[in-house]
Design a protein with these regions (language model features):
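Acidic, metal-coordinating catalytic segment for phosphate/diphosphate chemistry
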Residues: 140-195
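Active-site regions of enzymes building and remodeling cell-envelope glycoconjugates
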Residues: 19-23, 68-69, 165-172
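Hydrophobic alpha-helical segments within soluble ligand-binding/sensing domains
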Residues: 25-43, 174-186
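PRPP/pyrophosphate-binding module of the type I phosphoribosyltransferase fold
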Residues: 37-51, 58-164
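Glycine-rich phosphate-binding "P-loop"
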Residues: 11-30, 99, 104-105
Length: 195
């Protein structure tokens, strides 16, 4: 049984530093059913997009569960805190795109990816989702002025009133924690929540 729970640690190896059992609550267990309900499963007109090479494994999990194609944004950093989209790997032309990330801080990577999908890739609509919405600095202004139709985040970080936009959708993680705690109490598998 687990003694601690966490939502979407950025590096799975962190679990090795705890002296007690830890369950990593994956944000995908909330986000994937939401996407399936909104866009369907196995649709050819919707593409899951990794906003950078570091998010490919996460995006691939979404494509497998949702039976949707994958596209990848290949970006470069010519200098610190500056990213530039070099290529879009995969077909997004005429498609709805869903950018999948773990954390959105200043939203620079996310918005550059959304711009590239529309302007260079020919995507018809862009959506985005992430487990954690830090939304610091220029994030809100960037998101508001971007082609992103809807950003869905989890309530792992409280969204203050000055950060609330009509295009930001917040999903609760409490049901996942509730189910995990019940399974820990009943001494049944927690990991099957995230398969």
């Amino acid at each position: 049984s687990s003694a601690a729970s966490d939502v979407y640690k950025r590096q799975a190896q962190i679990q090795g530093f705890f002296d007690i059992p830890v369950d990593n609550m994956l944000g995908s267990s909330v986000l994937i059913p939401y996407i399936a309900g909104k866009f369907g499963v196995g649709t050819d007109d919707t593409v899951i997009v990794s906003p950078d090479l570091g998010s490919v494994t996460r995006a691939r999990k979404f494509t497998q569960k949702l039976d949707m194609p994958l596209a990848i944004i290949d970006k470069r950093r010519p200098k610190a805190n500056v990213s530039e989209v070099m290529n879009i790997i995969g077909n997004v032309e005429g498609k709805k795109c869903i950018l999948v990330d773990d954390l959105i801080d200043t939203a620079g990577t996310l918005v550059h990816a959304a711009d590239a999908l529309v302007e260079r890739g020919g995507a018809t609509e862009v959506y985005a989702c992430a487990s954690h919405g830090v939304l610091s600095g220029p994030a809100i202004e960037r998101i508001q002025n971007s082609p992103i139709k809807e950003l869905t985040i989890l309530d792992t970080i409280p969204l203050t009133n000055d950060k609330k936009l009509d295009k930001i959708n917040v999903l609760p993680v409490a049901p996942v924690f509730t189910e995990a705690i019940a399974r820990i109490y009943e001494e049944t598998s927690v990991s099957t929540l995230f398969d």
